[in-house]
């Protein structure tokens, strides 16, 4: 579960390495896979598309807490990760690194198509 002040990895090539969750959309206290959060960039790569300290939207694609699937199996990722998106819900990067759990919302189909592995 992702809360405010959670440090997250960025799973795309937008130029950000680490972001800090500063808000959750929908009036919730915690976010899970597929939820949209407001983040601030903490560390960036040179010549990236994002700037340090700027505020962006992101969708959660991996969480460390175990997730139970409908068939009874449990998925647990090694890190919390997000993909940065613009206001229209399209990813800022052109690649998504690492596995991604299937996002239930139809608005993030582009992220699932860019991912290397969808669980």
Curated annotation (Swiss-Prot):
<comment type="similarity">
    <text>Belongs to the universal ribosomal protein uL14 family.</text>
</comment>
<dbReference type="InterPro" id="IPR000218">
    <property type="entry name" value="Ribosomal_uL14"/>
</dbReference>
<dbReference type="InterPro" id="IPR036853">
    <property type="entry name" value="Ribosomal_uL14_sf"/>
</dbReference>
<dbReference type="GO" id="GO:0070180">
    <property type="term" value="F:large ribosomal subunit rRNA binding"/>
</dbReference>
<dbReference type="InterPro" id="IPR019972">
    <property type="entry name" value="Ribosomal_uL14_CS"/>
</dbReference>
<dbReference type="GO" id="GO:0006412">
    <property type="term" value="P:translation"/>
</dbReference>
<dbReference type="GO" id="GO:0003735">
    <property type="term" value="F:structural constituent of ribosome"/>
</dbReference>
<keyword id="KW-0689">Ribosomal protein</keyword>
<keyword id="KW-0687">Ribonucleoprotein</keyword>
<dbReference type="Pfam" id="PF00238">
    <property type="entry name" value="Ribosomal_L14"/>
</dbReference>
<comment type="function">
    <text>Binds to 23S rRNA. Forms part of two intersubunit bridges in the 70S ribosome.</text>
</comment>
<keyword id="KW-0699">rRNA-binding</keyword>
<dbReference type="GO" id="GO:0022625">
    <property type="term" value="C:cytosolic large ribosomal subunit"/>
</dbReference>
<comment type="subunit">
    <text>Part of the 50S ribosomal subunit. Forms a cluster with proteins L3 and L19. In the 70S ribosome, L14 and L19 interact and together make contacts with the 16S rRNA in bridges B5 and B8.</text>
</comment>
<protein>
    <recommendedName>
        <fullName>Large ribosomal subunit protein uL14</fullName>
    </recommendedName>
</protein>
<dbReference type="InterPro" id="IPR005745">
    <property type="entry name" value="Ribosomal_uL14_bac-type"/>
</dbReference>
<keyword id="KW-0694">RNA-binding</keyword>
